[in-house]
Amino acid sequence: MESGNERISSQSQGTIHLSKEPTFLIQQATLPSDLHSTLLQETQCGGLTKNIKANTQKRRPGTVILSKRSSRIMSETQPRPPVIPSRRPGFRICYICGREFGSQSLAIHEPQCLEKWRTENSKLPKHLRRPEPSKPQPIGGTDSHSLQAANEEAFQSAQAQLLPCENCGRTFLPDRLLVHQRSCKPKGENPGPPSMGSSNVPTGLKKASSGIPARPRTLICYICGREFGTLSLPIHEPKCLEKWKIENDQLPRELRRPQPQKPQPLPAGQSSQEGASQAALVPCPNCGRTFAVDRLPVHQRSCKSQPSGPKTSNSNIERKGGPNPPTNSKQQRNMEAPNGDKVTGVI
């Protein structure tokens, strides 16, 4: 009996112990189930992600197949890119230079561009000058078609200002054509007939057939033969003539020259200015070479003359290797001494 009571008491104590900590036991009892549920959720999520990855991997080749469709199908399904217009909408073209400007900027630009065009056109040779471009008449309406028509007319007006190169045929603006022709050489010997008659132009005014001035236009002074600009020559000639008179008066009478006359342009195309400058040259009385009046005295200092007059024959003999007078005093004494003295001297 006692042993049975002890067993009952031990069982009751165990139940009391269990009743004292019900939460701990409940947690111990519930932990395995929670872990199981969480593990199930994780495995389910992992399976879903694997399925999603597998599905995406399976779907990717489909996109590649879609990109390899024919161009016809692609053009039907995909949207077409927008068409960019050739010119910016709302901009107007200058009828002089062909550049684009806004509607408000064009009204400010056109007077300045026309003034610049007139200045550059006046600097060109006469055969390259162009008539002043006329502004096209405005077309009624404000739609895009009327603006495009006005721009097309202005563009054609600007293109009409271009000039073709005589050598290569390319077109340029008149002021740029001169720059181009400096490096564009003609292919043949005679690229084309010159527009300006070179026969009526003196050597100082001769230019290339293309009208490119390699240097500023010059004229030759009929007194001294030097070249001067077209504006500088009228200032130089009176001073040069006054200087010539002073220098001519200082010369001896036999060397004085008549006053040079200003030549008139010759119709045959001869260089009258060069002839006048050559006529103003004075020949040297010793050697016959011609010099300017002020340079002749400088030349005569080295080209000495004898008092009897010009001795051209002796000078010619000397040039040909004729007998020259002995310059050494010892040689001169030997030549003056008799032959017998020379023999006795040698013996």
From Swiss-Prot:
TM segment ranges: none
Zinc finger (C2HC/C3H-type): 90-119, 161-190, 217-246, 280-309
Region called Disordered, residue ranges: 124-145, 183-210, 255-277, 298-347
GO MF annotation list: zinc ion binding
Residue sites binding Zn(2+) 4 per the record: 284, 287, 299, 303
Disulphides: none
Annotated Pfam families: zf-C2HC_2
Compositional bias of kind Polar residues: 303-316
Tree of life domain: Eukaryota
Binding site for Zn(2+) 1: 94, 97, 109, 113
Assigned keywords, A-Z: Metal-binding, Repeat, Zinc, Zinc-finger
PANTHER family recorded: C2H2 ZINC FINGER CGI-62-RELATED, ZINC FINGER PROTEIN 474
Entry protein name: Zinc finger protein 474
